[in-house]
């Protein structure tokens, strides 16, 4: 029978893995969040930048940074990316901070959807690490990652659909413009030929 501590760890894992968030990023700003970790804890975060403007066809990007308990200590950095997944193994106990940045653009509709897949304590001295409980935790994490990835795919599909619709609109209006040019050119040629023959007949 699993010990109370093991059950508690599993419960914590399931709780954190269910945490899904969507936040609006301020123009030329950032949004930051905190996690209290013990040494050996693993913090896994996946994210997808998006646009709350339903008509947008641009794939927006941003930056992601994880800081240690000391604000100047940068542990993980990802620059100019549309999505990603970062895993950090806490080197020591402390108050860790992670931030999503929009500091290089004035876009006011940029948002980020992110999921915390789990804060899992790994006891390297536990001989039962590879037990059924461990397998259940891993399976739960993988299941959550698949579900989160599906939510990100929805965001990407919306962006790609808007891009396709925007391209179709441009092609449609360009075709109408070309048709108008052809009709105008044909009318001009008819008018010119009629005038030409009228002048010729008068001569």
UniProtKB/Swiss-Prot annotation:
Spans within the Lumenal topological domain: 21-172
Keyword set includes Protease: no
Broad class of the protein's primary localization: endoplasmic reticulum
Domain GOLD as annotated: residue spans: 30-118
Pfam families found in the cross-reference section: EMP24_GP25L (PF01105)
Signal peptide: 1-20
Transmembrane segments: 173-193
Ranges facing Cytoplasmic side: 194-203
Annotated coiled-coil segments of the chain: none
Compartments in which it is found: Endoplasmic reticulum membrane; Golgi apparatus membrane
Membrane topology qualifier: Single-pass type I membrane protein
Family under the similarity heading: Belongs to the EMP24/GP25L family.
Physiological role: Constituent of COPII-coated endoplasmic reticulum-derived transport vesicles. Required for efficient transport of a subset of secretory proteins to the Golgi.
Other comment: Present with 26800 molecules/cell in log phase SD medium.
Assembly and interaction partners: Associates with ERV25, ERP1 and ERP2. Also interacts with SAR1, SEC23 and SEC24.
PANTHER family per UniProt: TRANSMEMBRANE EMP24 DOMAIN-CONTAINING PROTEIN (PTHR22811)
Protein's UniProt name: Endosomal protein P24B
Naturally occurring in which organism (per UniProt): Saccharomyces cerevisiae (strain ATCC 204508 / S288c) (Baker's yeast)
Gene this protein is translated from: EMP24
């Amino acid at each position: 029978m699993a010990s109370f501590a093991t059950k508690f760890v599993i419960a914590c894992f399931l709780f954190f893995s269910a945490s899904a968030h969507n936040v609006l990023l301020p123009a030329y700003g950032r949004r930051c969040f905190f996690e209290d970790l013990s040494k050996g804890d693993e913090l896994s975060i996946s994210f997808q930048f998006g646009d709350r403007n339903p008509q947008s066809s641009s794939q927006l990007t941003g930056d992601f940074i994880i800081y240690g308990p000391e604000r100047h200590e940068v542990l993980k950095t990802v620059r100019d990316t549309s999505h990603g997944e970062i895993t950090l193994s806490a080197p020591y106990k402390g108050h860790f901070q992670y931030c999503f940045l929009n500091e290089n653009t004035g876009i006011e509709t940029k948002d980020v959807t992110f999921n915390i897949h789990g804060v899992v304590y790994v006891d390297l001295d536990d001989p039962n690490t590879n037990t059924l409980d461990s397998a259940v935790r891993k399976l739960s994490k993988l299941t959550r990652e698949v579900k989160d990835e599906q939510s990100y795919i929805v965001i990407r599909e919306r962006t790609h659909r808007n891009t396709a619709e925007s391209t179709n609109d441009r092609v449609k209006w360009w075709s109408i413009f070309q048709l108008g040019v052809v009709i105008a050119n044909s009318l001009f040629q008819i008018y010119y030929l009629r005038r030409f023959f009228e002048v010729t007949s008068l001569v």
